[in-house]
């Protein structure tokens, strides 16, 4: 009570703050001149809507999620991660609700390289490490550290070692190596040249890598 609101920001202040908050950069000279030179009513609302609809907003938010989800261009040091990256960016582009975004990640299944199925990269990222993956999931989405419960009951929480393994059992059946390429259907599409050039290139690189390991 008795507190007064801050005075209205100047156009210069608003412009800078809007760009930094929404797209993660300061405005260019041209953008600054265009905004400050406009006398249109509601130009601030128009600016915000334009920035929210821009690819810059997608890339700025992606930087946050890429860090949180530990995204890599090569998952588990051998699988191409571009499909996973594209899925995250498209989810942000569509302004996908948070609960839907998380649900699609934790319930992802199917071949990693299948078009539109990039959410499976969430599991491929920690291929062969189901316990570490579960600890990371809890840290990201529950905001709590449970990794110590892999070996013993949590010393500062009620979580037991048994409960940790019950959590981990949720993804026990996930096989990151099985049917990575989507089986016969995807290989046939590759043969019939129905896949984008960049996807075929990634598949070829993966096949070459496997061949080298076999030799």
Descriptions of predicted regions:
Residues 1-208, 212-215:
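Short, structured secondary-structure elements
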């Amino acid at each position: 009570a008795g507190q007064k609101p801050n005075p209205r920001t100047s156009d210069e202040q608003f412009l800078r703050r809007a760009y930094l908050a929404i797209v993660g950069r300061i405005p260019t000279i041209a953008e600054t001149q265009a905004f400050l030179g406009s006398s249109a009513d509601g130009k601030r609302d128009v600016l915000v809507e334009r920035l929210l609809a821009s690819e810059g907003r997608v890339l700025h938010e992606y930087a946050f999620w890429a860090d949180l989800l530990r995204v890599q261009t090569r998952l588990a040091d051998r699988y191409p991660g571009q499909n996973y990256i594209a899925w995250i960016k498209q989810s942000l582009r569509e302004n996908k609700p948070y609960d839907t975004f998380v649900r699609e990640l934790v319930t992802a299944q199917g071949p990693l390289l299948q078009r539109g199925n990039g959410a499976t990269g969430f599991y491929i990222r920690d291929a062969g490490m189901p316990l570490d993956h579960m600890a990371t999931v809890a840290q990201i989405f529950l905001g709590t550290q449970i990794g110590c419960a892999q070996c013993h009951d949590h010393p500062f929480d009620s979580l037991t070692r048994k409960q940790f393994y019950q959590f981990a059992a949720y993804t026990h059946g996930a096989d990151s190596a099985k049917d990575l390429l989507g089986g016969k259907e995807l290989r046939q599409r590759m043969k019939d040249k129905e896949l984008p050039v960049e996807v075929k290139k990634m598949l070829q690189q993966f096949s070459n890598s496997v061949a080298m390991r076999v030799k």
